[in-house]
Amino acid sequence: MPRNRRLTSSLSRPIVLFLVLLPALFVILRGWNGFAYPSTVAPYSDLTLSHFTFIDYIRQQLLENYTFPLWFPTILSGTPLIANPLAGLWYPFGWPAFVLPLPFAFNLLVGLHLSWGALGMYLLLRQQRLGIAASLFGGLAFGLMPKLFAHYGAG
């Protein structure tokens, strides 16, 4: 058996799972006490100014009125909330943010999205018949890509 084959065959599913979940762990641990990237250096991002505000308002309306709000009255003279893609009403994977504590919910969702992308890249590379080690490297390269973290920092 070639040396490379032994190396890749020794990687088990738990190791693959850990490496694919590494981006999520990175974001969650980095932002354990607050936002992972919109920090005091860059406090004015879309995440802190719009997403956080929308989620907080939706959560308040769910607790007080037991319904999803269709209108957001605090910006200008009010804006439609149901048609605003930043509010996330129609994105099921963002719904945990309505019940989880903020900003932990944002860190968790961003981390899981990065891990989902890393898993997708890993599976794509495996489908292209690359080895396990090369596929893991590609998945991690995607999941830990600085450009994606820059997007998170910008909101």
Regions from the language model: what does each represent?
Residues 6-14, 40-44, 126-133:
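Membrane-interfacial loop-to-helix junctions in multi-pass inner-membrane proteins
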Residues 23-119, 140-155:
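Membrane-interface coil-to-helix junctions
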Residues 122-144:
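Transmembrane-helix signature of polytopic, membrane-embedded enzymes
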Residues 17-18, 108, 135-140:
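Hydrophobic alpha-helical transmembrane segments
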